[in-house]
Amino acid sequence: MQFPLVKNSEGLDVTVSEGNYLLNMTSNDRLLRRNSFKGLMTTYHKYRNTLANTLSSNCRVSAFYATAHKYHDTLEACLSEDNIPPSLYDGLIETVHENLKPLHEYIALKKEILGLDEFHAYDIYQPISNAADSFACDFDEAKVKVTAALSPLGYDYHAALQEGFDKQWIDIYENKGKRSGAYSWGIYGVHPYVLLNYQPRYNSISTLAHEMGHALHSYFSNKSQTYINSDYSIFCAEVASTTNEILLLEHTLKTASPEQKIYLLNQFLEAVRTTVYRQVQFAEFEKFIHNEINEGRTLQAEMLETYWLDSNKRYYGPALTVDAELASEWSRIPHFYTPFYVYKYATGYSAATAFASAILENKPKAVEKYLHFLASGGSDYSLNLLKTAGVDLTTPLPVTVTCLLYTSDAADE
C-alpha cells in the first residue's frame, strides 16, 4: 500500500504513513492535518473491497470455530475465556450510548477553544495547550514525581516501587537496536523487567507510572500466588497501570500552572475519549459485523462505510463535521482481526477510575482492597476479583462515573 506525499502550509512535501499519521494529526498545521487525513483515507478507499472481503473472511473463520466448539456465536466464544457474560458487553455499549452527552460537549468545547467554524476528524488530535515542554525533567526527577504520586497506595507499594528503582528493573533510555515503545514483563520467581525509551516530557513520566503499575501487579501476584495462579488476565492487566496514570495526573494537577492544567486535563479528556468512547465504538462495530456474518451475509464495503459514518455522527455529535473520507477509517483498524478484544480497554479504564477515586477519597479499606486485587493474580475470574475489590463491572456504575463525573468535571475546569 503506497501512501502519497502531501503538502503542509509552507508548501513542503510531507510523507504520510501509518507510522507518522498520529504525529501529523497532532501538528498545529491544519493544512498538514487535513491533507494527511485525506491522503491516508483515500489510499485505504482504493482497497475497500479487498479489505472488506479480508475482514469478512476473518469473521467467518471465527464463526466456524465458535460453532465447532458449541458456542452460540463468536461473541460468546471470545468472552468465555474470561468467563464474561455477553450481557456485560451489551450493557457496556448501552451505558456509553446513554452517556454520549459529555463527549458531544467535549467536541463542542474543543471546537470553540480552537476557534474553528467547522470541526473535522482531523482536528480532534490538535493540542489546545503548548505546555508539554514545561514538564521536562530527567529520569531521577521523574522517579521522585511518580513515587510522590503513588504514595496514597501505602508503605508496601512504596517499598516495592523503590525496590524496582534501586535494583534496576528498568532499561531506561533509547539505544541502538532497542525496540520502540514501552512494556513490562513479569517472570515468575524473578523480579519484573521494564523497558522504556524515556524522553524528558510528561508522557514519558506517565509511561513510567503506567509500566511500573504492570510491574508491581506482577510483583505482588508472583509473591502471593502459585505459578498456576500468578498470571493475571488481560481484562485485569490495564487496571493496575491506568490507576497509576490517574494518580499521577491528579497529583501533578495540584501544583500545575493554569496553562499546565489545561494540558493535563486535555490529556485526561483524550484518554477517556480514546480508551472508553472510541473503544466502545469499535466494540459496537465488531458486534455489527459479526452479526452480519451470523445472519449469513457477506461484508460489503458500502455497508461498512455507511455504518461507520453513522457511528461517528452518533458518537461525536453535531459539533463534528463528518467528511466522506472518514467512511474508510474502519479498514485501517487492526484490532478488528482479533474479535471482541477492544472492549477490555474501556472496562479496564473504568475500573481504574473507580479504584483511583476510592483511593484518593480515602474510602474505607480502599487501598487494602486494591492491593489485595493486585496480589490475587489469576486466582479467580476477572469479574470476581474486581468485585471483591469493590468494582462491579456487571453494573453500569463504573462506566457511567467515568463518562460523567470525570469527563464533565474536567471539561468544566
Each model region followed by its residue ranges:
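C-terminal, non-catalytic "cap/extension" segments appended to globular domains
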Residues: 112-122, 208, 216, 246, ...
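Short pre-active-site segment immediately N-terminal to the catalytic Zn-binding motif
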Residues: 195-208
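Basic, alpha-helical terminal appendages of large translation-related enzymes
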Residues: 1-39, 77-87, 126-143, 356-358, ...
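His/Asp/Glu-rich acidic catalytic environments and adjacent acidic regulatory segments
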Residues: 1-87, 91, 95-98, 145, ...
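Auxiliary, metal-adjacent structural segments of Zn-dependent hydrolase domains
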Residues: 133-188, 201-202
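A short, hydrophobic C-terminal helix/tail in secreted or cell-surface proteins
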Residues: 409-413
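Long, well-ordered alpha-helical segments
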Residues: 50, 54-74, 103-114, 213-223, ...
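Post-HEXXH active-site segment of zinc metalloproteases
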Residues: 218-239
